[in-house]
């Protein structure tokens, strides 16, 4: 049986942490930033963990990654 393919889009968007959790980037930070406050943009920096309700979908897109 052939290997399962990883979704290319998911490979670029998610990183698996050593503990098995998955980190992702924040949304709403690409464009239309002039109307957003500095505080709002600052809070959108950095990465956050994928919520547990979405982990099944993310794990299906990233087979063989230990999720």
Swiss-Prot record:
Gene Ontology molecular function? structural constituent of ribosome
Q: Name one GO cellular component term.
A: cytosolic large ribosomal subunit
Transmembrane residue ranges = none
Q: List the disulfide bonds.
A: none
GO BP of this protein? translation
Q: Does the keyword Thylakoid apply?
A: no
Q: Which UniProt keywords apply?
A: Ribonucleoprotein, Ribosomal protein
The UniProt annotation puts the region (Disordered) at: 1-23
Key word Ribonucleoprotein present: yes
The family this protein is said to belong to: Belongs to the bacterial ribosomal protein bL35 family.
Q: What is the recorded name of this protein?
A: Large ribosomal subunit protein bL35
State the species of origin: Variovorax paradoxus (strain S110)
């Amino acid at each position: 049986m052939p290997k399962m393919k990883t979704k290319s889009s998911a490979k670029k968007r998610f990183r698996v942490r050593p503990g098995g959790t998955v980190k992702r980037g924040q949304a709403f930070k690409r464009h239309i930033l002039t109307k957003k406050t500095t505080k709002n943009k600052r809070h959108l920096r950095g990465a956050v963990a994928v919520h547990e309700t979405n982990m099944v979908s993310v794990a299906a897109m990233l087979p063989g990654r230990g999720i």
